[in-house]
């Protein structure tokens, strides 16, 4: 779809969406996302120029259908896939990608840490019409025996190779600095970001500053050549409620704000990653803090999980926090699956995580009163009142699940036109009863009254006592 758009920008000194937006140009990608979001293309251009919206769209990813991530757009969700050093299978990752696409993930991140990482990523990119993100330090680690052996040049080479392959956005943990890491020493769970922990160990062993920070301008130059979007990683995010909103988290966030402005000086797009595990009451404050420190760059949050006691159900604990975060300004939600904290998610875990987060994102869009956000809810409600079961299934977030649940107790085809489900049956279905009230159910109508005044309620042996 984008091949001709990309060809027209070939050879230009700066190809980024932000660069064109700041020059007053509405690119084809901007016009496309404006149509998808039902926004004025000029508003999209202004938001991209200001840095409040990003369109992750690497020139080397022509298969991509662009999307917008930002406060003016609908809330997006990301699904993580990728193998581990324990299990590696290209076909399984493509199955996961298929699940992501079928259930409506807006972006996908390949977090592979084992096997032939470039091959897995190449397959995902060539099959993905949605933006693909990565965490480059994972592949870097596959090239050395120990993280302490990483070199700045090796990091930059991997980043360049991934950009040239077509990766649309990359998590860069450039805010984990030597003077901030000790602030996490008193935490219950310490550093829970893999990238953050690896870089902390590298700095401790080498006695040098974070190479992603010291070479940030060089990374900007790479991103500028391909139009890769920064996803500034929160390497010091809290990993439990007790560690939330602490000194380390906000010290890193302040650095991420500085790096955001530095990337913008290169006309490179930026979104900022956020926590993590956060008590429900602290989420609005965390969203406000990011807006202040990072100049309203789109906030991309992992959950946050609002309780630590539910392994196996963390797609639920985190979706609760995600809905609140999105209501208060988060632009993209990184899903969590039932396998979180327990193991590598399979395709079914991926499906459950996506569905939970689609619900959270949609609930936030409704709460923020985005134009048209509630249209599907209202259409499904009308179908429900009309007992149009097939239409209800079609409008459902997960049609297969809705149909399966219904058919488990009423599998007959005749049940698809029945005015009841197996919960209430025909005698107790409130909507069926109401729909048969006739004229009395019309707006402004009054139900008919008996001519005589009601008699005092009685029971055998005398009148019922009246409570006072």
Swiss-Prot record:
The answer to whether the entry has keyword Metal-binding is yes
EC numbers: 4.1.99.17
Q: Which Pfam families match?
A: ThiC_Rad_SAM
Q: Which reaction does it catalyse?
A: 5-amino-1-(5-phospho-beta-D-ribosyl)imidazole + S-adenosyl-L-methionine = 4-amino-2-methyl-5-(phosphooxymethyl)pyrimidine + CO + 5'-deoxyadenosine + formate + L-methionine + 3 H(+)
Q: Which free-text remark accompanies the cofactor?
A: Binds 1 [4Fe-4S] cluster per subunit. The cluster is coordinated with 3 cysteines and an exchangeable S-adenosyl-L-methionine.
Cofactor(s) for this UniProt protein: [4Fe-4S] cluster
UniProtKB keywords: 4Fe-4S, Iron, Iron-sulfur, Lyase, Metal-binding, S-adenosyl-L-methionine, Thiamine biosynthesis, Zinc
MF terms in GO: 4 iron, 4 sulfur cluster binding; carbon-carbon lyase activity; zinc ion binding
State a GO cellular component annotated for this protein: cytosol
Q: Which GO terms describe its biological process?
A: thiamine biosynthetic process; thiamine diphosphate biosynthetic process
The positions making up the signal sequence are none
Name the source's superkingdom.
Bacteria
Identify the residues that bind Zn(2+). Answer: 277, 341
Q: Where does substrate bind?
A: 80, 109, 138, 173, 193-195, 234-237, 273, 300
Indicate which residues the UniProt annotation says bind [4Fe-4S] cluster: 421, 424, 429
**Which top EC class is named for this enzyme in its record?**
lyase
Segments spanning the bilayer are none
Pathway participation? Cofactor biosynthesis; thiamine diphosphate biosynthesis
**What does the record list as coiled-coil region(s)?**
none
Q: How does it assemble?
A: Homodimer.
Protein family according to the UniProt entry:
Belongs to the ThiC family.
Task: Give the function comment from the record.
Answer: Catalyzes the synthesis of the hydroxymethylpyrimidine phosphate (HMP-P) moiety of thiamine from aminoimidazole ribotide (AIR) in a radical S-adenosyl-L-methionine (SAM)-dependent reaction.
Name of the protein described by the UniProt record: Phosphomethylpyrimidine synthase
Q: Which organism is it from?
A: Anaeromyxobacter sp. (strain Fw109-5)
């Amino acid at each position: 779809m984008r091949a001709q758009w990309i060809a027209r920008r070939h050879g230009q000194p700066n190809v980024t969406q932000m660069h064109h937006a700041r020059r007053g140009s509405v690119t084809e990608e901007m016009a496309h996302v404006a149509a998808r979001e039902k926004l004025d293309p000029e508003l999209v251009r202004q938001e991209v120029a200001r840095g409040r919206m990003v369109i992750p769209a690497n020139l080397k990813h022509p298969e991509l259908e662009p999307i917008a991530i930002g406060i003016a757009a609908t809330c997006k969700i990301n699904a993580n896939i990728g193998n581990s050093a324990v299990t590696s299978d290209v076909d399984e990752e493509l199955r996961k990608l298929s699940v992501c696409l079928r259930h409506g993930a807006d972006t996908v991140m390949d977090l592979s840490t084992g096997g032939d990482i470039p091959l897995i990523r190449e397959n995902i990119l060539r099959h993905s019409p949605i933006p693909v993100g990565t965490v480059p330090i994972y592949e870097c680690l596959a090239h050395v025996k120990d993280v302490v052996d990483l070199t700045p040049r090796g990091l930059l080479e991997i980043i360049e190779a991934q950009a040239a392959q077509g990766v649309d956005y990359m998590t860069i943990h450039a805010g984990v600095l030597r003077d901030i890491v000790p602030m996490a020493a008193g935490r219950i769970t310490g550093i829970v970001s893999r990238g953050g922990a690896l870089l902390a160990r590298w700095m401790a062993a080498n006695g040098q500053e974070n190479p992603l920070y010291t070479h940030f301008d060089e990374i900007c130059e790479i991103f500028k050549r391909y139009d890769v979007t920064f996803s500034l990683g929160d390497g010091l995010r809290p990993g439990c409620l007790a560690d939330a909103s602490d000194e380390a988290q906000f010290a890193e966030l302040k650095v991420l704000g500085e790096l955001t402005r530095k990337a913008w000086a290169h006309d490179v797009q930026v979104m900022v990653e956020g926590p993590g595990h956060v008590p429900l009451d602290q989420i609005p404050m965390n969203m406000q803090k990011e807006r202040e420190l990072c100049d309203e760059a789109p906030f991309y949050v992992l959950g946050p999980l609002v309780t630590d006691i539910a392994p196996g159900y963390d797609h639920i604990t985190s979706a609760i926090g995600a809905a609140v975060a999105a209501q208060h300004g988060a632009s993209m939600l990184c899903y969590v699956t039932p396998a979180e904290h327990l193991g590598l998610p399979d395709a079914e875990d991926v499906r459950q995580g996506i569905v939970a987060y689609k619900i959270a994102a949609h609930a936030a869009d409704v709460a923020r009163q985005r134009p048209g956000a509630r249209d599907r809810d209202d259409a499904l409600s009308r179908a429900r009142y009309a007992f149009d079961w097939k239409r209800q299934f079609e409008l459902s977030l997960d049609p297969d699940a809705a149909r399966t649940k219904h058919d488990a107790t009423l599998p007959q085809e005749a049940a698809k036109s029945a005015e009841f489900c197996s919960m209430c049956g025909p005698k107790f279905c409130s909507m069926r009863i109401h729909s048969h009230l006739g004229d009395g159910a019309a707006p402004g109508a009054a139900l008919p009254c008996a001519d005589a005044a009601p008699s005092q309620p009685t029971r055998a042996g005398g009148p019922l006592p009246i409570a006072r």
